[in-house]
Regions:
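Conserved alpha/beta enzyme-core scaffold
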Residues: 2-555
Length: 555
């Protein structure tokens, strides 16, 4: 007979609520400071000192645009003898105090996605041994890990308004807040939200109060950056030429109707060419209808001209609030009229829901691997790796996706267009197409297990330079891909790998196209082709609804 199961001794029985008990203990330590869930502004620093433990994993809301800066400034003032060696999870390192935490020893380890404004200082702190990098992630990768192996102990986030029950209204810049809060709250972590004000009735509830432990009114409105605003005054004739070639040789050729534009003047030029050059080609209604995109001011002329059907946004953009409210057929807005942005959902849309990602890069090697990480500058990638790859889980077909089928087989699959834009030389005459990415050396020096590559070459389908377009997906074998890229690399070291005869062969086979092959006249490619040539022009296009930040005003 089988023996009866033996119950484990009570002493060996596991405890199943340790995280909840630990949270209750921490909350009890600060209960005397709070009125319900409301912490007084003056008590925040004291509360953080009581809530945090050495080595805690802290998710700090430094997003692309909005920053929980009252929380980060207060955190940076804590006594490192009591709170130290924190593991910081932050999507965008944007503010000086984010790195003050490492200089003071309050934080030790960092997992992040983007560090544009602070990239030089990040590199220096790594070199000095003050900062350890776990990994440079794409946005959704970092948030995914918050649900798996980087679960936060504490989350420090920001919102526009709260009520006395802790319900949050995030307004146009929802961005990453719901994801960070959910990952923390439902693993019995502590969530503190700084808000601009506490009011009786919220315009809408974006995050329920049952997910929030404390709200605190900040000493000033949370910081927000107009990260995606590009002044058309700075778009060059060369960028206009590249934009015209991209429209003719990619957008029109494949009928790209759903897309994401990366940040930069290259893509801003394309947005401003749609109502002029695109209109002259009869492309309205055929391309660029549905977007996963922040509300770029440079998209205003295309919207006003009837090109755009919808825009789902990662975040908002300073000054675009009134314009968005006045265009509810285009943007995702709530009953209150304000934008509902969501970075994770928009990244998902940009990964699986669009036909094309197109964006700029700082450096590319001969295999089309690209990175924004260069010597002395650890920038990170943001969302580019997520949207700039071919998601092999995709199963729905669109005309653009199907056109990239190259195999002749009963079982075939289409492919997402992944387009990289770069001028062959950076400012100062430094080649942008190089034998080896700086990222390889940066990764080695920083002790990273792999080089911090932004977009891997085998995901890139097209490369656009001022010389022309390389249709890499058509290549038969790695060497032919390298030759096609070299054909548009100008007089860089990569460009010198092929001779004129080989370039002509590639042109004849459709792997390379120059401006003349596309019917684009370089003489026509100048700033007069842009629908708006200044911020003032964008304001005029918007009917005065766009209110640019002061730094972009010249009137």
């Amino acid at each position: 007979m089988p023996s009866e199961p033996v119950a484990p001794p009570c002493a060996q029985a596991p405890r199943w609520a340790r995280r909840g008990a630990a949270k209750a203990e921490r909350l009890g330590a600060v209960a005397h400071l709070a009125d319900g869930c409301v912490l007084p502004t003056r008590s925040l620093e004291q509360a953080l000192g009581l809530l945090l433990r050495p080595g805690d994993r802290v998710a700090l809301e430094g997003n692309n645009q909005k920053q929980a800066d009252f929380l980060s400034r207060s955190l940076a003032r804590l006594d490192p003898a009591r709170v130290h060696d924190l593991h910081l999870l932050i999507s965008s390192i944007s503010r000086p105090e984010h790195l003050d935490l490492f200089e003071r020893g309050i934080a030790r380890r960092l997992d992040f996605s983007f560090a544009g404004p602070q990239s030089l200082r990040v590199a220096q702190l790594i070199e000095d041994g003050r900062l350890e990098v776990g990994a440079i992630h794409t946005y959704v990768e970092l948030y995914a890990r918050m649900l798996i192996d980087l679960q936060p102990d504490v989350a420090l986030v920001c919102a526009d308004k709260a009520d006395a029950q802790g319900n949050l209204y995030t307004g146009p810049n929802t961005e990453d807040t719901p994801t960070i809060v959910e990952a923390t709250a439902f693993r019995q972590g502590i969530v503190i939200a700084q808000v601009n004000e506490i009011c009786g009735e919220l315009p809408r509830v974006d995050i329920p109060g049952s997910w929030i432990d404390f709200v605190v009114v900040a000493d000033r409105p949370f910081a927000i950056e107009p990260l995606f605003t590009r002044d058309p005054r700075h778009i060059t004739d060369l960028q206009v030429l590249m934009g015209m070639m991209a429209i003719r040789g990619i957008y029109e050729r494949y009928g790209v109707s759903s897309l994401n534009h990366g940040i930069g003047f290259d893509t801003a030029a394309i947005e401003l060419l749609l109502p002029t050059y695109g209109e002259s080609l009869g492309l309205k209604g055929k391309i660029c209808r549905n977007w996963a995109l922040n509300p770029h001011p440079t998209l205003i002329p295309a919207i006003e001209s009837g090109w755009v059907e919808s825009v789902h946004c990662f975040g908002s953009e300073v000054g675009m609030e009134r314009y968005i409210e006045a265009r509810p057929d285009i943007f995702f807005v709530g009953r209150d009229g304000s934008l509902r942005s969501n970075r994770v959902l928009c990244q998902l849309a940009g990964q699986y829901g669009v036909d094309m990602f197109i964006g700029s890069t700082l450096q590319m090697d001969g295999d089309a691997n690209s990175s924004t990480v260069t010597l002395g500058r650890l920038t990170g990638f943001g969302g580019a790796p997520n949207m700039g790859h071919d998601p092999r889980g995709r199963r729905h077909a669109t005309p653009a996706w199907l056109q990239l089928i190259t195999a002749d087989s009963p079982v075939v699959r289409g492919r997402k267009l992944v387009v990289q834009l770069l001028e062959t030389f950076q400012s100062g005459g430094v080649p942008a197409l190089v034998e080896s990415l700086d990222a390889v050396e940066v990764g080695r020096r920083s002790g990273m297990p792999i080089a911090p590559v932004m977009i891997y070459g085998d995901d890139v389908t097209h490369v656009v330079t001022e010389e022309g377009i390389a249709y890499l997906y058509k290549a038969q074998g790695q060497q032919e891909r390298r030759d096609a890229l070299a054909a548009v690399a100008g007089v860089t070291p990569i460009g010198q790998r092929v001779n004129a005869q080989r370039v002509e062969q590639l042109r004849q086979r459709g792997l390379v196209a120059f401006a003349s092959d596309l019917g684009v006249s370089p003489l026509q490619a100048n700033r007069s082709m842009l629908a708006a040539r200044s911020i003032e022009d964008l304001v005029a296009w918007s009917g005065g609804l766009y209110e640019p930040p002061a730094r972009f005003r010249s009137w």
